[in-house]
């Protein structure tokens, strides 16, 4: 019998920190289910959620400002263990009768925390055992200047006298540093101490248990009905296909729209993996000509994204309408999509780019929704894919934008540009694999620049196209640094592209970070 993997869980109340989702991922890695909710969620829902502990996240606001987000009273009335992180510790202190103040200087980066009192949270944790010190990551302007009644100061730094505090009888804890980031060396151990030892959660959130749970859920939900899935070849839809094939077999039909804007040979790879190897019923629609016709004369990146997304919906609808027995639509929605969707309702989110096929299918479609990954982060989806038997190379492939090469060809999209770019990109990726560099960068790809540069072919001058190479290193894709690939490697890639592809005279390497640049060029 499958254990109830949602029984023991943690609730994270989000005050707007950039690291909040990272807290959730770290807790999931421990093996415990958790969810992220806005800090001002309704008291009734927070209490009925059934969490075994609550974490108050960091945030960008100042507790010294009027109207700053405050820790809700009902959280402290719940008798649950509470861990406040950074702003979460500060709002806990203010709410319970302590005080905060603005620091003379922001404390950002590496810091050394001296453990003054080894309470349950800190007991046995140290990076320098003889001194009871922890190497941590700080990111704050305010700090707690007076602990609330009943609290004990448990740690300090050279800059702030209260770096952590606790009230053991209530199981309330606060840390000014960020245990969720890898720079805090004992961070994962500290979170495990809170989640497992203090809150008493069992570690049931594993790939094997998640698969069993979702198979049972899908079977119960869809019964004997047919399910239709838009298969893109990306990680999310591929894992959904593998999971549903295991759950309902021939009841699943996948629609694979070959846009002509995919990576080199990707369409054939998708068919070989799912239709031939796994026995999935896949309908392949060769729609390249429709996409290139629709994109003719279109130069604006946002317009291209919308055309590509809308045409996908149109083609998918056409195919779905042929399948009268289909009662359910499966999608690869993942947990960050759910969090961002909820966050956008606050009005604080800003659209930087239109995202392809995220909640894009029309509401008038009468199909029920099946979203077996909606509780999972991307790293969990990848682990699920491996557990389901998908090749490691497919599951851990670099991200690829929904509009595909359509946003890696600057300006107008033409078939000859797409073919040239796909081949150049394949050469770049092939060389990364051969040099054992592919897994050392977070994302790498080629970009087609619609400008011609003079070159020499034989004894003649030629004006031919320019290809840009882009490789970045990042933890969360919110910020990124360009990857310092070796010069001899870049030379090899450049020589191969220019020599093997007719029509390219120059290759350049993008050394822009994010910010100010985005990872994709469009």
Curated annotation (Swiss-Prot):
The UniProt record lists the keyword ATP-binding: yes
Reactions the enzyme catalyzes: XMP + L-glutamine + ATP + H2O = GMP + L-glutamate + AMP + diphosphate + 2 H(+)
GMPS ATP-PPase domain ranges (all copies): 205-397
Keyword tags: ATP-binding, Glutamine amidotransferase, GMP biosynthesis, Ligase, Nucleotide-binding, Purine biosynthesis
Binding site for ATP: 232-238
Enzyme Commission number: 6.3.5.2
Cystine pairs: none
Keyword ATP-binding: yes
Listed InterPro entries: Class_I_gatase-like, GATASE, GMP_synth_C, GMP_synth_GATase, GMP_synthase, GMPS_ATP_PPase_dom, NAD/GMP_synthase, Rossmann-like_a/b/a_fold
Name by which UniProt lists this protein: GMP synthase [glutamine-hydrolyzing]
Phylogenetic lineage: Bacteria, Pseudomonadati, Pseudomonadota, Gammaproteobacteria, Lysobacterales
